[in-house]
């Protein structure tokens, strides 16, 4: 099963992806983790990304899709994968579609974790306080969420048009949300 897990910051994507990895026995591919490991490994794409990040810029879609192409060529993804943190915009969604078409393996489903803004703000602010982060004020969190919503709304529409978007309530205990995802996927 080839899946994308979408959701705003604080929605529990990483937690749910880790749970789904165990349940479905397929790899969890986090673009953030992938980027960091490519940089540490000193791959050509990792070196390009490091140079871009050192200048304070965002890593280009071309570099990210190159890293994904490399990762998706590994044998452990033959039975599927859970992609977390990508795509974040419409051009990335189109690039991912093209890449998966090249491999002959289109996405089976896109799971959108839906969590109300007030719950997200509470989760992130609580996490920030526990970690001693002063930059995650409620106003800063709301701004990040707005940026996420503005860039990701077209992606959600893109997958909804294709009939593979599954909306899942992301509020509740870990096991409750995991169960909702499993039901939505028909597992």
Swiss-Prot record:
Keyword hit for Transferase: yes
Protein name: Adenylate kinase
Keyword set, alphabetical order: ATP-binding, Cytoplasm, Kinase, Nucleotide biosynthesis, Nucleotide-binding, Transferase
InterPro entries: Adenyl_kin_sub, Adenylat/UMP-CMP_kin, Adenylat_kinase_CS, P-loop_NTPase
Entry similarity comment: Belongs to the adenylate kinase family.
GO biological process: AMP salvage
Entry binding sites for ATP: 10-15, 127, 172
Originating species: Xylella fastidiosa (strain M12)
Gene name, Swiss-Prot/TrEMBL: adk
Binding positions for AMP per the UniProt entry: 31, 36, 57-59, 85-88, 92, 133, 144
Subunit organization: Monomer.
């Amino acid at each position: 099963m080839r899946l994308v897990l979408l959701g705003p910051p604080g929605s529990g994507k990483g937690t749910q992806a880790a749970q789904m990895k165990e349940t479905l026995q397929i790899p969890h591919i986090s673009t953030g983790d992938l980027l960091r490991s490519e940089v540490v490994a000193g791959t050509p794409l990792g070196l390009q990304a490091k140079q871009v990040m050192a200048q304070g810029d965002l890593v280009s879609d071309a570099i990210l899709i190159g890293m994904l192409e490399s990762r998706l060529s590994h044998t452990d993804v033959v039975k599927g994968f859970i992609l977390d943190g990508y795509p974040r915009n419409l051009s990335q969604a189109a690039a991912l579609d093209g890449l998966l078409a090249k491999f002959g393996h289109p996405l089976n489903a896109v799971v959108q974790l839906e969590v109300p803004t007030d719950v997200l703000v509470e989760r992130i602010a609580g996490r920030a306080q526990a970690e001693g982060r002063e930059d995650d004020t409620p106003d800063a969190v709301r701004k990040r969420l707005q940026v996420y919503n503005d860039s990701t709304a077209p992606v959600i529409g893109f997958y909804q048009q294709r009939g593979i978007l599954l909306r899942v309530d992301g509020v509740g205990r870990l096991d409750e949300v995991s169960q909702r995802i499993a039901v939505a996927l028909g597992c």
